[in-house]
Swiss-Prot record:
Name of the featured protein: UDP-N-acetylglucosamine 1-carboxyvinyltransferase
Native species: Allorhizobium ampelinum (strain ATCC BAA-846 / DSM 112012 / S4) (Agrobacterium vitis (strain S4))
Residues modified to 2-(S-cysteinyl)pyruvic acid O-phosphothioketal: C126
Gene behind this protein: murA
Pathway note: Cell wall biogenesis; peptidoglycan biosynthesis
Annotated positions binding UDP-N-acetyl-alpha-D-glucosamine: R102, R131, P132, V133, D134, L135, K172, V173, S174, V175, D317, I339
Region forming the signal peptide: none
PANTHER family xrefs: UDP-N-ACETYLGLUCOSAMINE 1-CARBOXYVINYLTRANSFERASE
Length: 430
């Protein structure tokens, strides 16, 4: 099992290219099931989750070509992938694949919309709470579908003639459930109105792609989205938006270690709340042509309290990284998690590096320390693992991050990008 070895103490200076967003790429890839034409996606990142979803889509009958050729990957960062699903050959999504990644459960929407039936295993993925599928089930039932849970699978059937448009209000904001409803309702009969919809940029990106395919969606980016169902969707070409979580992660790394880094190919408007928190912490963050410039001051980090919230609030996927930054703040900061339960598993590992963190319910109290010291640590999930890398960059001595397969799920060539900016980071294969 691979490990990441980090020797801390170096400021980051240079250019880091930002990859396409995993959280946008996955639903866009799944949308290829909605059409028999070719959907071409540009800026798709090289990630373990993407590779797994390619396998899942292949099982359903999607023909996949990378950069116009049948190859696994090129030598560059993000790539172009062509998806063609002339016929859906299997409406079953098996446990052995779906259990490895929660987002693969989202195929239930397109399968139900296009084929009228689906048998999908209950999902897996990061161990950060229960994340129930009730919102997905209730939303699809509102469109007329019949859904039953049997032996760990959801058996879904559309009414005769297909799904039926309806008005539905999510009791809780859910990005994944909004994705599924957008895809399913695009081919439903009549008009669907989603209330309390997720407003995340990745939801907007999916809606824009579906519209390019011939869907009729309005209101994306607001809490109310309207979808006028169409009889079929066509192919399209769409570019995956930049990864705002990767952007914020590297920005926090620069703020913590010091230095001057250009984050290339990203958009500052995708993470206004996180940028504001970084500025309050003392980092200089500014928009430049085709990117963001971040200047960090390392030892002059100010404490900042944050609360995670659905977009446009502070992203839960940057909570662990920001907590890592606050371990070096000059004072006491508080981080409150409102999206997921059990998302403080990185606290014990940060403590191994010398962090002073105490928990009270869903709030962490971080008392900044003058220095962190390297130590062996264990990655517990995707975002927690990268917070340990950030902390290791600022720690004295050597940090070994174990179980880095979590990193490979969401960060494209992380050690390569950091090394280019002066960090001492290497992957060790046992």
């Amino acid at each position: 099992m691979d490990r990441i070895r980090i020797v801390g103490g170096n400021a980051l200076n240079g250019i880091i290219p930002i990859s396409g967003a995993k959280n946008a790429a996955l639903p866009l890839m799944i949308a290829s099931l909605l059409t028999s034409d070719t959907l071409t996606l540009e800026n798709v990142p090289h990630l373990a989750d993407v590779e797994l979803l390619l396998r899942i889509l292949g099982n359903h009958g999607v023909d996949i070509a990378v950069n116009g050729r049948r190859e696994r990957q090129s030598g560059s960062y993000s790539r172009t992938i062509h998806f063609t699903c002339r016929t859906i050959v299997d409406t079953n999504a098996p446990y052995e694949l779906v259990s490895k990644m929660r987002a693969s459960f989202w195929v239930i929407g397109p399968l139900l919309a296009r084929e009228g039936k689906a048998r999908v295993s209950l999902p897996g993925g990061c161990a950060i709470g229960t994340r129930p599928v009730d919102l997905f089930i209730d939303g699809l039932r509102a469109l007329g579908a019949t859904l039953e849970i049997d032996s760990g699978y959801i058996e879904a059937t559309a009414p005769k003639g297909g799904l039926i448009g309806a008005s539905y209000t999510f009791p809780k904001v859910s990005v994944g459930a909004t994705h599924v409803m957008l895809m399913a309702a695009s081919l439903a009969r009549g008009t669907t109105v989603i209330h309390n919809a997720a407003r995340e940029p990745e939801v907007v990106d999916l809606a824009n792609c579906l519209n390019a395919m011939g869907a009729k969606i309005t209101g994306q980016g607001t809490a109310t989205i309207t979808i006028e169902g169409v009889t079929s969707l066509s192919g399209a070409r769409h570019r995956v938006l930049p990864d705002r979580i990767e952007t914020g992660t590297y920005a926090m790394a620069v703020a913590m270690t010091g230095g001057d880094v250009t984050l290339e190919g990203t958009d500052i408007t995708l993470l206004d709340t996180a940028v504001e928190a970084l500025r309050r912490a003392g980092a200089e963050v500014s928009a430049i042509e085709d990117g963001i410039r971040v200047i960090g001051h390392g030892d002059a980090i100010r404490p900042v309290d944050i609360v995670t919230e659905p977009f446009p609030g502070f992203p839960t996927d940057l909570q662990a990284q920001f907590m890592g930054l606050m371990t070096r703040a000059q004072g006491v900061a508080h981080v409150t998690e409102t999206i997921f339960e059990n998302r403080f598993m990185h606290v014990q590992e940060l403590a191994r590096l010398g962090a002073k963190i105490t928990l009270s319910g869903q709030t962490a109290r971080i008392e900044g320390v003058q220095r962190l010291r390297g130590a062996p640590v264990m990655a517990t999930d995707l975002r927690a693992s990268v917070s340990l890398v950030i902390a290791g960059l600022a720690a004295e001595g050597e940090t070994l991050v174990n179980r880095v397969y979590h990193l490979d799920r969401g960060f494209e060539r992380l050690e390569e990008k950091l090394t280019r900016c002066g960090a001492i980071v290497e992957r060790i294969s046992d």
